[in-house]
Design a protein with these regions (language model features):
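Phosphate/nucleotide-binding beta-alpha loop and adjacent structural elements of enzyme active sites
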Residues: 1-181
Length: 181
């Protein structure tokens, strides 16, 4: 990983360099997809040029350049619950911000958090709708209701939505939260 893109307040992308010395100490790269259900392998559709539209679900609009499939591969899948089950909670008692933008797999990933969603996540940013983009329909209202019923309150709604966990209302303002588009 060379860099991550962070959407700043002035609406420009800022490149954050990742220190290679931190890999395997503070940063672990796990080459797997996330979803719900049991661990398995699944099909992954890699789009041409990687414009951010690759997905576990086949694109509907492959006539558009950003949805042209370059390759179809099999990838391993786990849930965030599986990951959080071995997370060092004794060192990090909560996750300040969880950002999910997984091209129509977002609801699957959030459901795959299990109780960790309501117990350990302070801020949540998700892409709640990819309507007419993939051969998989995420119901935005059902997705939103699931998050709210998990103890979250809305910060902003739209295609990308932000929420905060009411369980952490006493510390939410001490966290340097930024909406990550």
């Amino acid at each position: 990983i060379q860099y991550m893109k962070n959407f700043t307040e002035d609406q420009k992308y800022q490149i954050i360099q990742l220190d290679p010395k931190r890999i395997n100490k503070n940063l672990f790269i796990i080459e797997t997809a996330l979803s719900d259900g049991e661990p398995r392998d699944t099909t992954f559709y890699c789009t041409k040029g990687d414009p951010g539209t690759s997905s576990m679900y086949e694109p509907l609009r492959q006539n558009e350049e950003v949805f042209k499939v370059k390759d179809v591969i099999n990838v391993p899948v786990i849930t965030l619950k599986h990951f959080f089950d071995v997370f060092p909670w004794d060192k990090v008692s909560y996750i300040e911000q969880l950002k999910v933008d997984a091209q129509s797999a977002d609801f699957d990933i959030i459901r795959g958090c299990g109780d960790y969603l309501s117990e350990r996540i302070v801020y949540l940013d998700v892409e709640i709708s990819t309507s007419n983009q993939y051969k998989h329909y995420e119901n935005p209202q059902e997705f939103h209701n699931y998050i709210v019923n998990s103890g979250f309150e809305v910060i902003s709604l739209g295609g990308n939505c932000s929420y905060y966990n009411k369980r952490y209302s006493n510390i939410k303002d001490t966290i340097n939260y930024k909406f990550l588009n």
